[in-house]
């Protein structure tokens, strides 16, 4: 069965690395030197965690990403 998970990827200018995580699944986070690498790493880690956890993962159907504007 195929499932789609939401991943969040940010660029860290201090380390010059992309940092990725899947909020729905504890333990799924990784880094990569490019977007392609971090995507590949996230998929690999996610597959390993899901294989280990079996049906214990509570997959969320919706995750919101909001832009919040503030005065600075």
UniProtKB/Swiss-Prot annotation:
Any GO BP annotation: regulation of DNA-templated transcription
Transmembrane segments: none
InterPro entries attached to this UniProt entry: TA_system_antitoxin, TTHA0281-like, TTHA1013/TTHA0281-like
Span of the signal peptide: none
Cystine connections: none
Pfam families: UPF0150 (PF21748)
Similarity annotation: Belongs to the UPF0150 family.
UniProt name for this protein: UPF0150 protein TM_1321
Organism: Thermotoga maritima (strain ATCC 43589 / DSM 3109 / JCM 10099 / NBRC 100826 / MSB8)
């Amino acid at each position: 069965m195929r499932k789609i998970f939401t991943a969040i990827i940010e660029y860290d200018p201090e380390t010059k690395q992309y940092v990725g995580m899947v909020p729905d699944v504890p333990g799924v986070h990784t880094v990569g030197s490019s977007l392609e690498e971090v995507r590949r790493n996230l998929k690999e880690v996610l597959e390993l965690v899901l294989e280990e956890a079996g049906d214990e993962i509570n997959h969320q159907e919706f995750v919101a990403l909001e832009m919040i504007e503030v005065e600075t």
